[in-house]
């Protein structure tokens, strides 16, 4: 199972850690505008490797975990990039 998380913060990171514990055969890909967050997530084993929006065509699941105002811009890009059987979760929070 190929899971992509866009926005590797508390919510997105927590979700993929749970997915990894329940489905250890999953491969977790991370997309984040903050390169240091992405590098830290890889070093900590939260995600397996970095990805780009173009890579979303391979996704089984996409978790969009960005602030709601950013999600409005990101979701159209995600929907244009994914396959017809990909499941997308939007889990942004309003603070």
Where do the language-model regions lie?
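Rossmann-like NAD(P)-binding element
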Residues: 53-89
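Rossmann-fold NAD(P)-binding glycine/threonine-rich loop
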Residues: 91-95
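NAD(P)+-binding Rossmann beta1-loop-alpha1 motif at the extreme N-terminus of oxidoreductases
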Residues: 1-53
């Amino acid at each position: 199972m190929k899971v992509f998380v866009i926005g590797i913060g508390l919510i997105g990171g927590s979700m993929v850690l749970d997915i990894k514990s329940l489905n250890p055969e999953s491969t977790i890909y991370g997309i984040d505008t903050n390169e240091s967050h992405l590098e830290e997530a890889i070093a900590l084993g939260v995600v397996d490797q970095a990805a780009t929006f173009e890579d979303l065509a391979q996704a089984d699941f996409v978790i969009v975990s960005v602030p709601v105002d950013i999600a409005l811009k990101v979701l159209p890009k995600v929907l244009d990039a994914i396959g017809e059987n990909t499941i997308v979760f939007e889990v942004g929070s309003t603070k």
